Amino acid sequence: MNTYKKLLFVYILLIIGVSSIPGQAMPKSWFSWGWEDKIYHMIEYSVLGILAYLSYCDHVRYSFSLLVVSGFSFGLFDELYQSLIPGRFPNAFDVIADGIGVTLGSISTHYLRKVFND
């Protein structure tokens, strides 16, 4: 198992771990616009997209499409899982932000690798 796959596995466990924190135990921001958590979701899932791309996209045919679909699916799973945690609620916009994050992370990694490998 390569280093990126190990990091991906640990990062997935980290996402699940954070999703397991009950809502009342989550830290509150000093100020809130009401949408900044979508930015956090995009950043969180961009890292997931980067690690998934580095782990699998050189080895699997149609891997980019599979990566994006898997990222959206994991985001959906994560939101459904959160519905089982006290004080946490699923949100369709979080799933969309997760999917955008995975897509942006993997696309940016693809192009950065092309630029720096050529």
Predicted region positions:
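Membrane-interfacial alpha-helical segments at the cytosolic side of multi-pass membrane proteins
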Residues: 44-59, 101-113
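Post-HEXXH active-site segment of zinc metalloproteases
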Residues: 52-72
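Interfacial helix-loop-helix junctions of multi-pass membrane proteins
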Residues: 28-34, 77-100
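Helix-loop junctions at the membrane-solvent interface of multi-pass transporters
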Residues: 18-21, 56, 84-85, 107, ...
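Small-polar-interrupted transmembrane alpha-helices in polytopic inner-membrane proteins
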Residues: 10-19, 66-83, 99
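"…centered on the first transmembrane helix and the immediately adjacent amphipathic helix/loop
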Residues: 1-54, 67
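Membrane-interface helix-boundary motifs at transmembrane edges
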Residues: 1-3, 56-62, 115-118
